[in-house]
């Protein structure tokens, strides 16, 4: 049995895919790297330049240089027990799917973005995808795995997850890392890189109503959310941090920051703005979903969550409360908490902590995480959360209105290392107060 990594000379393969493969049980499994790059040193040396690997793992790895429009070198390698994994530019996908149809294989894993446009995705959809899994590793983050069950089984949380209580929902991803050396990012931008996949899936998870513990039901529920989503294109804003052009050594109108408001046309979420915020070159790495409650239900929220009305120093009266938020912090805390703002100071009440969430994650996937789960599942034929072609198509349809336009004349510029651009803060306030 073999795992073939297409694009094995790339950043993702070297930073995440090969390290994940080295941490799972690969007894009886060989690993083949395939890419256009020709090396004048052993591929094992290439891998060791960016990671630490055991001699046992490196002995399993071979490397084949070759083009993506001619996979004849793989005919002797790939058989009905071979896992194929796409970690190549999405512009290559159509060509690669065409060539792979000439090979035997067990299953294909496909990295996001699934194509470089909605048109190219529809071309991909025209191939036989019966043995293809579209991958989004955010669906395998511990809190994202646990979230449907937490919402379903925590009475207070389930009660407040609707427009009867919620004023707005922010889905936020902040990264310190910029675009340094990443030509892939400059071609795609933050919307195609993050929003079309990871942030869209987080929206689907938090807004869906899953009544039974089933991955199929969870996926269907996300799809129902996406069918009802509309992007407010007039209020979207796009930014680029001020050092970006210097870092990539060329002029660019690629957005490194975006704020995307979305409405969900269902009775449950009608008139609640969902605001996706994603940025690189920020002051911290943080991923979280923030549900802000309406002022008229503050007291009810405090009662529902049985939150003590006493901070560390004094009693908190309802009329002193400025804001009440329910936060699903995916990173770095990995916990669910209620946050009450009193006198400008937040009082936090943890509802589900990291230890509990890690336990729920272990119940679902054992001791593996992220790409370890993906490769172990593909190799062993196990079920795991992934994206169907129908779900991927719906996400393309939701975000295509802002993916298909030039943003060159729309960009604002922000300082690298900022907490949040003032342009985004002002627009978020305007949307919430509308």
UniProtKB/Swiss-Prot annotation:
Sites binding NADP(+) 2 sit at 286
Catalytic activities: D-glucose 6-phosphate + NADP(+) = 6-phospho-D-glucono-1,5-lactone + NADPH + H(+)
State one molecular function term (GO).
Answer: NADP binding
InterPro entries registered for this protein in UniProt: G6P_DH, G6P_DH_C, G6P_DH_NAD-bd, NAD(P)-bd_dom_sf
Positions annotated as active site in the UniProt record: 198 (proton acceptor)
Q: Which Pfam families match?
A: G6PD_C (PF02781), G6PD_N (PF00479)
Q: Set out the biological process GO terms recorded for this chain's protein.
A: glucose metabolic process; pentose-phosphate shunt, oxidative branch
Keyword entries, A-Z: Carbohydrate metabolism, Glucose metabolism, NADP, Oxidoreductase
| Listed EC numbers | 1.1.1.49
Instruction: Establish whether keyword Heme is in the entry.
Output: no
- Binding of NADP(+) 1 occurs at 7-14, 36, 93, 112
The residues that hold D-glucose 6-phosphate are 112, 137-141, 175, 193, 280, 285
Q: So, what pathway does this thing act in? A: Carbohydrate degradation; pentose phosphate pathway; D-ribulose 5-phosphate from D-glucose 6-phosphate (oxidative stage): step 1/3
- Function summary: Catalyzes the rate-limiting step of the oxidative pentose-phosphate pathway, which represents a route for the dissimilation of carbohydrates besides glycolysis. The main function of this enzyme is to provide reducing power (NADPH) and pentose phosphates for fatty acid and nucleic acid synthesis.
Hey, which family's this protein in? Belongs to the glucose-6-phosphate dehydrogenase family.
Task: Identify the HAMAP family for this entry.
Answer: G6PD
What name does this protein carry? Glucose-6-phosphate 1-dehydrogenase
Please give the organism: Encephalitozoon cuniculi (strain GB-M1) (Microsporidian parasite)
């Amino acid at each position: 049995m073999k795992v073939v990594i297409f694009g094995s000379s790339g950043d993702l393969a070297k930073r995440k895919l090969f390290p994940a493969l080295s941490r799972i049980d690969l007894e009886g499994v060989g690993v083949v790297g395939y890419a256009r790059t020709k090396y004048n040193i052993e591929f094992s040396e290439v891998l060791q330049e960016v990671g630490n690997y055991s001699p046992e793992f490196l002995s399993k790895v071979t490397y084949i240089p070759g083009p993506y429009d001619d996979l004849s070198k793989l005919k002797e390698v790939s058989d009905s027990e071979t896992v194929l994994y796409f970690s190549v530019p999405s512009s290559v996908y159509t060509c690669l799917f065409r060539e792979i149809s000439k090979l035997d294989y067990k299953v294909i894993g496909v990295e996001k973005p699934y194509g470089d446009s909605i048109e190219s995705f529809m071309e991909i959809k025209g191939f036989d995808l019966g043995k293809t899994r579209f991958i989004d590793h955010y669906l395998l983050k511990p809190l994202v795995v646990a979230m449907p069950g937490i919402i379903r089984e925590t009475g207070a949380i389930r009660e407040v997850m609707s427009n009867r209580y919620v004023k707005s929902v922010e889905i936020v991803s902040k990264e310190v890392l910029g675009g340094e050396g990443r030509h892939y990012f400059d071609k795609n931008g933050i919307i195609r890189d993050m929003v079309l996949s990871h942030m869209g899936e987080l929206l689907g998870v938090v807004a869906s109503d899953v009544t039974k513990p089933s991955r199929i039901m969870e996926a269907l529920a996300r799809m129902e959310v996406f069918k009802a989503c509309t992007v407010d294109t007039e209020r979207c804003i796009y930014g680029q941090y001020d050092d970006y052009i210097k870092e990539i050594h060329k002029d660019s109108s690629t957005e490194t920051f975006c704020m995307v408001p979305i409405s969900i046309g269902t009775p449950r979420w009608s008139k609640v703005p969902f605001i996706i915020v994603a940025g690189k070159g920020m002051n911290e790495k943080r991923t979280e979903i923030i549900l802000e409650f309406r002022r008229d239900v503050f007291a009810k929220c405090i009662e529902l969550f049985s939150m003590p009305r006493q901070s560390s120093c004094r009693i908190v009266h309802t009329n002193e409360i400025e804001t009440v938020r329910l936060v699903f912090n995916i990173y770095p805390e990995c916990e669910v908490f209620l946050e009450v703002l009193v006198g400008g100071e937040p009082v936090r009440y943890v509802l589900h902590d990291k230890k509990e969430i890690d336990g729920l994650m272990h119940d679902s996937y054992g001791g593996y995480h992220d790409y370890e789960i993906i490769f172990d599942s593909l190799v062993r034929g196990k079920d795991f959360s992934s994206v169907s072609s129908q779900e991927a198509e719906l996400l393309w349809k939701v975000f295509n209105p802002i993916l298909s336009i030039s943003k060159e004349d729309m960009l604002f510029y922000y300082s690298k290392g900022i907490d949040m651009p003032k342009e985004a803060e002002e627009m978020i306030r305007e949307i919430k107060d509308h």
